[in-house]
């Protein structure tokens, strides 16, 4: 059973780096072409104030993913390590297929008329609910319950890695990005991650 003190207890450096790398990579790849990345582009184009938008993305992701990872830990109490391993494999395979499906926002009306920080925080937090990056965070939390804080740090950094450049180049149109090719490459990487998890 998960012991909540493990959130802050030190882990071996090698394990921490492994969890951090997997968390960053998984979420950064899953975020490519995702609706929250498109939301970042929309927010940047609308407000043209990158600092409050990036701060809002950071805090919204931290809050959302902390909750998601904790829920994953709760589920992990009822699953064996072998089952968790194959849940992770299946999740990577699912991501490989999911990433190939173009995502879109529900509409600009979902963006608040408040200031850039408040509007970005609310919009980003709500957009993450049920999103594939949130689901991935829950699964990672279940798999690496002994290093939960590093899962949260890694998934948050992964979101920033994928979204900060989009905010900074918000003047560019998403139509000019080779999203089709990017999605295919990303799907291939998720497939490799699934194979590596299953057999190594």
Curated annotation (Swiss-Prot):
Protein name (record): Putative manganese exporter
- Please name the source species: Vibrio cholerae serotype O1 (strain ATCC 39541 / Classical Ogawa 395 / O395)
Superkingdom field: Bacteria
List locations, semicolon-separated.
Cell inner membrane
Function per UniProt: Involved in manganese homeostasis. May function as a manganese exporter.
Q: How does it sit in the membrane?
A: Multi-pass membrane protein
Q: Any idea which UniProt keywords this protein has?
A: Cell inner membrane, Cell membrane, Ion transport, Manganese, Membrane, Transmembrane, Transmembrane helix, Transport
**What cellular component GO annotations does this protein have?**
plasma membrane
Residues that span the membrane, as ranges: 13-33, 53-73, 81-101, 110-130, 150-170, 180-200
Q: Which family does it belong to?
A: Belongs to the GDT1 family.
Q: Other notes on this protein?
A: Expression of mneA suppresses the manganese sensitivity of an E.coli mntP mutant.
Asked if the Swiss-Prot or TrEMBL record annotates the protein with the keyword NAD, the reply is no
Q: Which Pfam families match?
A: GDT1 (PF01169)
Q: Taxonomic lineage per UniProt?
A: Bacteria, Pseudomonadati, Pseudomonadota, Gammaproteobacteria, Vibrionales
Recount the UniProt induction comment for this entry.
Induced by manganese.
User: Is Membrane set as a keyword in this record?
Assistant: yes
Q: What happens when the gene is disrupted?
A: Mutant exhibits sensitivity to manganese but not to other cations. Under high-manganese conditions, the mutant accumulates high levels of intracellular manganese with a concomitant decrease in intracellular iron levels. Mutant also shows a small, but significant, increase in resistance to oxidative stress induced by hydrogen peroxide.
A GO MF annotation of the entry reads: metal ion transmembrane transporter activity
């Amino acid at each position: 059973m998960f012991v909540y003190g493990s959130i802050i207890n030190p882990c071996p450096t090698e394990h921490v780096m492994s969890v951090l790398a997997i968390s960053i990579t998984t979420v950064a790849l899953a975020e490519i072409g995702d609706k929250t990345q498109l939301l970042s582009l929309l927010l940047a184009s609308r407000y043209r104030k990158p600092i409050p938008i990036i701060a809002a993305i950071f805090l919204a992701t931290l809050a959302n993913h902390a909750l998601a990872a904790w829920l994953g830990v709760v589920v992990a109490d009822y699953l064996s390590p072998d089952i968790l391993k194959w849940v992770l494999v299946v999740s990577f395979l699912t991501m490989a297929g999911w990433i190939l499906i173009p995502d879109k926002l529900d509409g600009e009306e979902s963006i608040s008329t408040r200031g850039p920080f408040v509007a970005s925080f609310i919009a980003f937090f709500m957009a993450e609910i049920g999103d594939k990056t949130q689901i991935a965070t829950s699964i990672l939390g279940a798999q690496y319950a002994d290093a939960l804080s590093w899962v949260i740090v890694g998934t948050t950094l992964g979101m920033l890695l994928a979204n900060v450049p989009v905010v900074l180049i918000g003047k560019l149109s998403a139509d000019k990005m080779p999203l089709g090719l990017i999605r295919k490459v990303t799907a291939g990487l998720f497939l490799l991650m699934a194979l590596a998890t299953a057999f190594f």
